[in-house]
Amino acid sequence: MLRPQGLLWLPLLFTSVCVMLNSNVLLWITALAIKFTLIDSQAQYPVVNTNYGKIQGLRTPLPSEILGPVEQYLGVPYASPPTGERRFQPPESPSSWTGIRNATQFSAVCPQHLDERFLLHDMLPIWFTTSLDTLMTYVQDQNEDCLYLNIYVPMEDDIHEQNSKKPVMVYIHGGSYMEGTGNMIDGSILASYGNVIVITINYRLGILGFLSTGDQAAKGNYGLLDQIQALRWIEENVGAFGGDPKRVTIFGSGAGASCVSLLTLSHYSEGLFQKAIIQSGTALSSWAVNYQPAKYTRILADKVGCNMLDTTDMVECLKNKNYKELIQQTITPATYHIAFGPVIDGDVIPDDPQILMEQGEFLNYDIMLGVNQGEGLKFVDGIVDNEDGVTPNDFDFSVSNFVDNLYGYPEGKDTLRETIKFMYTDWADKENPETRRKTLVALFTDHQWVAPAVATADLHAQYGSPTYFYAFYHHCQSEMKPSWADSAHGDEVPYVFGIPMIGPTELFSCNFSKNDVMLSAVVMTYWTNFAKTGDPNQPVPQDTKFIHTKPNRFEEVAWSKYNPKDQLYLHIGLKPRVRDHYRATKVAFWLELVPHLHNLNEIFQYVSTTTKVPPPDMTSFPYGTRRSPAKIWPTTKRPAITPANNPKHSKDPHKTGPEDTTVLIETKRDYSTELSVTIAVGASLLFLNILAFAALYYKKDKRRHETHRHPSPQRNTTNDITHIQNEEIMSLQMKQLEHDHECESLQAHDTLRLTCPPDYTLTLRRSPDDIPFMTPNTITMIPNTLMGMQPLHTFKTFSGGQNSTNLPHGHSTTRV
């Protein structure tokens, strides 16, 4: 059958229409696919516009079903490279860039010399010193151009937060100011679980970060200024990442914690953060501040051929040296101290940290701080040769070495040594070497960490500033640590960053259990709650039922605020509880008694009537024959320090002849240790009473003389106020010089020696050779708020504003 010719075009038209429709559909599908690809690409590689240019990060899923994905922005510059003429100078803002900067890989770390032979092992965590091969992978790319930070941004919204902006937590890594990098700590888990933005930073270390000549040639504290510059960058740019610049918390462990503590005392960091978490270290620790920077700078300059007399020429020579030559020099600091670290420059750190705390300079910040149960493990681990504990000789040697290096004055050293041994002997089990080992760990823990932390907490809480204290009692099972060890220095770090939730890593190679996962969730909840509200209990409740069926005992615990009277703290462990007065007796021993005991023999010179040394005491004791004191305490390598300008100490105590009327120090005693301690305490109280009586008598006599004076002409009150302020801010070094001068002038008059008592200030942290000395160019630590004074650092200036009269100190800018 034939089709009509008029209908022949219909199939052709239909075919054409189908082809056109298919083409359009194909194009539409292709465009849609491209669009979704671009969206997915943007989600996978997000781009953020900062004040200095655009950066592209990486969206990273985490290996746990309870953790959401995190955006990572790695190697973001926060300052210009501190190279060339910028070496030994404060940091400067970074340069802008065009286009999109790749921020998916870490940048170079700050120069450091990771040699196991020269590390300060006692001050570093075990996971750090036993993982040097792993750490080398993090620090192998070193460069002076190292001022970069890493940002971890969670993707999920917080149902407990109404504020769309997320709180920010900035981690300052530790490492005895000489080692470490922010790159080795992954903030992804903490950011995801706690729904906060976590930022880790690199800052200049060691010689490049803290070298100081003690004058204007090289002021020091460049590492601290790097941290402050990072905080300034965060304040300016964190909003682009969804962060709240008004809710910034800085936190750190070890040397990082002491940096955090120092930043709370510096005017340079005002307004850059609101809260601080101080883990195992404060500005009051003996190793927190370098009191003799010029000494170690001279040693370095001599080693590299830059030992010019003029400090400006010396620093210029050091600037021209290759950084590798500088950091590879071996400079050993005094035991329990540092060679290159923060210094009191009169500007960034305007005065001694204890004085600044007493003035209330850190009351603007909410603070959470604490210690681990066995911080002093590394000090003892090197002494013990096996698992059997500590022998009596090892114990005696450790105490003797400790006293010689921290309190190396000849006056009262024997009394102090015996008192410490008495305090740290478990008299119910004194023959047990394992008990002896435990008490020795406690000695170093209390002195280096606990006493400074409690003192810091007391000073911060005395005016009602929010303060929370914790004691960390848990540690993971690991072959890196001896089986007898408690929670050591740095053991809290993996729990803070949620490492148990993803399992062992090369850096934290522990056998994590469900209990470890639960405790890590608890710690992260406390830390991030504090960052959100300043209260570790709010807004997120403790709930870990999703981890295992065991009840979470932290649900029933309310972490109470710390105050100097009750001293409440949270025991963080598998059996949590709120307790009070953490190691109060030992803390009082170090803070109240020891500062008087270490110079006690000078007091004995006033009251003793002994004219010659008694014969050796061979009295029989239940545990053997009593030896002479010369054999009781093993000698150390540190030589005894002979007092200058005091001839009576140079006399031979065994010299025969006519009776010597010079009062001598009794070096051999026939009374027991208990009686020695009792007499020591009694003599201290007697000495203090004499001082108090003398002060009262002086005031009464002065008032009597003033009543007979004629009224003086009216004076210029403006000049008086200026004069009072100048006196008030006199530097610690100048005070020390005046004190020494007064004492020297009085040494010729024995009857007046009671009017010149030893200077007990800050004895917890000073070593014998750490007494500040003055040179023509020495910084005198005058705050830059004085009218007409120029700040020592040009990094940032502060106007001398009017202070509130309600503050604890006239120069304080903080709240009560």
From Swiss-Prot:
Residues in the Extracellular compartment per record: 44-676
Sequence ranges of Basic and acidic residues compositional bias: 649-658
Expression across tissues: Expressed in fetal and adult brain, prostate and testis.
Annotated glycan sites: 102, 511
Membrane protein topology class: Single-pass type I membrane protein
Annotated positions of the Phosphoserine modification: 712
Protein localization: Cell membrane; Postsynaptic density membrane
Main location, first listed in the record: membrane
Keyword Cell inner membrane attached: no
Residues of the signal peptide: 1-43
Cytoplasmic face residues: 698-816
Region feature Disordered, mapped onto this chain: 636-659
GO terms of molecular function: cell adhesion molecule binding; neurexin family protein binding; scaffold protein binding
Interaction with NRXN1 as annotated region, ranges: 359-364
Disulfide bonds: 110-146, 306-317, 476-510
Cellular component GO terms, alphabetical: asymmetric, glutamatergic, excitatory synapse; membrane; plasma membrane; postsynaptic density membrane; postsynaptic specialization membrane; symmetric, GABA-ergic, inhibitory synapse
BP term (GO), one: presynapse assembly
Pfam families: COesterase
Family membership noted in the UniProt record: Belongs to the type-B carboxylesterase/lipase family.
Family annotation (PANTHER family): NEUROLIGIN
Function: Cell surface protein involved in cell-cell-interactions via its interactions with neurexin family members.
Protein name: Neuroligin-4, Y-linked
